[in-house]
């Protein structure tokens, strides 16, 4: 077969991504509505699972992570789909702190089977905190920085 297009080697890699400090492990029970015509979880639901894990992690901080003046935005998403998620079943979403910057945090993610033996997806998201008035980046909330290790 021809070689992959230049610059796509990492994206097409079958090797799981390296991740940092574990922030959250959230079990999720699959729902019938998550399925597609192929009788496995639709790929768009993977993003919903990640969103739910991020929000639960933010809420677990015990301090403000969003205010009237500042809020996080999803700036980038990278998802490697490794194996379909069959129904019925359960999964675990794991979030990790991969990088902590001045106004952003890169959160690694893994979606595995409940017993951790099957990796369904991995990758990362970049969250940037902005000033709601100006739309410009603003420093990370202290709780996010402290817990994520920055």
Annotated model-derived regions:
Residues 1-11:
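Short, Lys/Arg-enriched N-terminal segments with co-localized hydrophobic residues
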Residues 12-26, 81-87, 98-150:
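HotDog/MaoC-like acyl-thioester-processing domains
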Residues 13-76, 131-150:
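Hot-dog-fold acyl-thioester-processing enzymes
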Residues 43, 51-54, 86, 92, ...:
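Short linear sequence elements within intrinsically disordered, low-complexity coil regions
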Residues 57-105, 120-121:
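Hydrophobic beta-strand-centered segment that forms part of the acyl-chain substrate-binding groove
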């Amino acid at each position: 077969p021809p070689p992959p297009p230049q610059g796509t080697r990492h994206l097409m890699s079958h090797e799981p991504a390296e991740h940092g400090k574990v922030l959250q492990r959230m079990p999720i029970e699959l729902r019938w509505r998550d399925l597609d015509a192929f009788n496995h979880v639709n790929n768009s639901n993977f993003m919903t699972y990640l969103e739910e894990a991020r929000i639960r992690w933010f809420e677990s901080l015990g301090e403000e992570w969003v205010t009237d003046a500042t809020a996080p935005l999803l700036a980038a998403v990278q998802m490697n789909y490794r194996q379909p998620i069959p129904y019925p079943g359960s999964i675990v979403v794991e979030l990790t702190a991969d990088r902590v910057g001045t106004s952003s945090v890169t959160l690694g993610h893994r979606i595995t089977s409940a017993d951790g033996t099957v990796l369904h997806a991995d990758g990362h998201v970049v969250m940037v905190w902005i000033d709601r008035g100006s739309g410009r980046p603003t420093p990370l909330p202290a709780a996010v920085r402290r817990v994520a290790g920055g």
